[in-house]
Amino acid sequence: YCTGCESFWTEKEVTENKGICPDHQIPYIRLSEENYYLRISEFSDRIREAIETDRMKITPEFRKKEFLKFLENGLDDVSMSRPRKNLSWGIPVPGDPDQVMYVWIDALANYITVIGYPDQPEWEEYWPANLQVIGKDILRFHAGIWPAMLLGLGLPLPKELLVHGHISSGGV
């Protein structure tokens, strides 16, 4: 687990990164807790096909190749909740007062809920997005978890993910 990313990492990823998060330069910690999981593994092939055919285009091309390499062994199911006892904030998991939603699940859902999904029919005027601009450090969330959520809901994928590097100001 990386506390900077607020994300679980697989044993393979931890080994490949020599136990250090490449984005935060801090060691991963071993963590065990009860969570709900989103079965994104079931969508690996459909996501791969959407990216390979540019139905969900990833630009620049080297970021597309980077994510397709990440997809080679399929996606791992992802924890979608955290124990409430460990957090002083969070959206409660419906029907389970002991759990709150993992921040990336509710953050990604904002793309469609802010335009009225599922209650206001006008949301369909704005979705699918023509372009989503994201940072390089959140590509796996936007090209893996987010498409799996959309496919699970039977919704179309964004048309393009434009992945930029980090923008700094004054050396920061």
List where the protein language model places each region:
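Structured secondary-structure scaffolds
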Residues: G4, P22-V172
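Residues immediately within or flanking Cys/His clusters that coordinate Zn2+
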Residues: K18
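Cys/His-rich Zn2+-binding cysteine-cluster or related metal-binding knuckle/ribbon modules and their
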Residues: Y1-T15
